[in-house]
Amino acid sequence: MKFFLKESKVEKHGRQHLEKVMECYLKFEELMEAFYRGDCRLVSELTKEIAIKEHEADEIRRKMELEFYEGAFLPFDREDRIMLVESIDKVADVIESAAFTVSLGKVAFPAEFRDDFRAMMKVTGKTIRALHECVESLETDLGEAMRKVHEIERFEDEADIIERKIITGLYSAYRQDRIGVVKFLDMKEITRKVANISDRAEDASDRALIIIAKRRG
C-alpha cells in the first residue's frame, strides 16, 4: 500500500510541476506584451513573478526527486520519469532566462518587428500547451501523447522559421541604420532566448517519446 501511496504523491506533484511551468509561460506572454508597449515597470514586475514561479517549480521538482529516491515507481520506469521532469523543468528555466534578458536590456521595442514577435510567441504558446497535453496523456492515452509529440515537432520547426526571419530582419535594419548596434544585439539575444523555449519543449517531448516507446513495447 505504501508503494502506491508514493506513486500517487509523485503523480500529484508532477501535475503541480507541469502547472507551474505553464504559469511561467502565461506570465511571459504578459511580459512580452508589456515589452511591446515599452512598459519597463511592468516588465520588471512580471520578471520577478516568473522568477518566483520558476523557484516554486524547482521546489516541486526536488520533492519529486526525493520521492523517486524513496522508491516511487519501478526502477525501469523511474529513470525515464526523472528525466522527463528535469526536461520540463528546463522549460521554466529558459522562460525565466528570456524574461530576465528582456528586463535587463530595457531596450525600446522596434515596432516593425511586433507582428513577427507575436507570431513567434503564438507558436511558442502552442508548443507549451501541446507539451502540457502530451504529458497529461501519458497516463491515459499513449496515442494522443504521440500525436502531441508530432505537433510539438511541427510547432518547433515553425518557431525556427520565424526566428530566422526576425534575425534576418534585424541584420537588415542594422545595416540600413534603422536600429543601432546596442538595440540590434539586445534584440537578437531576446529573439534567440524566446526561440529557445520551443527548443526545450521539444527536448521534453523527446523524453516523453521514450516513455511512449517503452510502454508500447
From Swiss-Prot:
InterPro entries: DUF47, PhoU-like_sf, Put_Phosphate_transp_reg. It comes from the Archaea. It holds the Pfam family PhoU_div. Belongs to the UPF0111 family. This is UPF0111 protein MTH_1689. The lineage of its organism: Archaea, Methanobacteriati, Methanobacteriota, Methanomada group, Methanobacteria.
